[in-house]
UniProtKB/Swiss-Prot annotation:
Name of this chain's protein: Triosephosphate isomerase
Organism phylogeny: Bacteria, Pseudomonadati, Chlorobiota, Chlorobiia, Chlorobiales
Assembly information from the UniProt record: Homodimer.
Job of this protein: Involved in the gluconeogenesis. Catalyzes stereospecifically the conversion of dihydroxyacetone phosphate (DHAP) to D-glyceraldehyde-3-phosphate (G3P).
Keyword match Cytoplasm: yes
Keyword Phosphoprotein: no
Organism: Chloroherpeton thalassium (strain ATCC 35110 / GB-78)
Length: 252
């Protein structure tokens, strides 16, 4: 039985005080009883340590929104997976559509980042998904398959124990549009089939696949009820503590 996983991607939102306040409120609303699903939050790099101080020793795990594919060196402005791991991070989000769109990240770059993160025992949430134009052109599956195979290239079955895939249809991110549970389930099942082909049935059955794309309190329970949807990568709704906690409870 796969354990549901809800992660909040705060993107470039919340200054230091705002991040600490939001993390504190989420903890308070969750209460003393640990959630039955796994939970992580990904603040900006600047707020990582302050947020870690708030959630340390709680059930909430610290995640990062990106990393570079080298451990150290003359890479101005970059943060390495090793630095994140040494600062208390347990997860890193890689290949998010906004990274692909605004920073020209390719599947090859995502793959290098995935490998580097895994090499320092930092678990990965690898994002894949199609644009509206690609969906309307009927190439959703070929786009997603290329991203999955490219991002997971040269990984082992053992590596896959530390990988989560997030399916995020680009046309549903921050637009208010959401894939129907049936649309999302179809792609999630397809992704699981690709992973089965690459790594075998056991790895595919154990892989958690999150859905990301305008997940809200009103649709979370129905989405998470689909057989191949194992939680969510939450954007805008994760910036509101009450909404985020309600979504977490939808996954329990």
């Amino acid at each position: 039985m796969r354990k549901k996983f809800v992660a909040g991607n705060w993107k470039m939102n919340k200054d230091l005080l705002g991040a600490v306040s939001l993390a504190t409120e989420i903890l308070q609303l969750l209460g003393d009883e640990a959630p039955t699903c796994e939970v992580a939050i990904a603040p900006t790099f600047l707020c990582q340590q302050a947020v870690f101080q708030v959630i340390d020793e709680s059930a909430i795990k610290l995640a990062a929104q990106n990393c570079f594919y080298e451990d150290q060196g003359a890479y101005t402005g970059e943060i390495s997976a090793a630095m994140l791991r040494n600062s208390g991070c347990e997860y890193v989000i890689l290949g998010h559509s906004e990274r692909r769109q605004y920073f020209n990240e390719t599947d090859e770059i995502v793959n290098k980042k995935v490998k580097n993160a895994l090499s320092v025992e930092l678990d990965v949430i690898m994002c894949v998904g199609e644009t509206l134009e690609q969906r309307e052109s009927g190439v959703t599956k070929s786009v997603v398959e290329t991203q999955v195979r490219g991002g997971l290239k040269d990984l082992t079955a053992e590596d896959m124990k530390s990988v989560v895939i997030a399916y995020e249809p680009v046309w549903a991110i921050g637009t208010g549009k959401t894939a129907t549970p049936e649309q999302a389930q179809e792609v999630h099942a397809f992704i699981r089939g690709i992973v089965k082909d690459m790594f075998g049935e056991e790895v595919a059955n154990e892989l958690r696949i999150q859905y990301g794309g305008s997940v809200k309190t009103s649709n979370a329970k129905e989405l998470f009820g689909m057989p191949d949807i194992d939680g969510g990568l939450i954007g805008g709704a994760s910036l509101n503590a009450e909404d985020f906690v309600e979504i977490i409870k939808s996954a329990e």
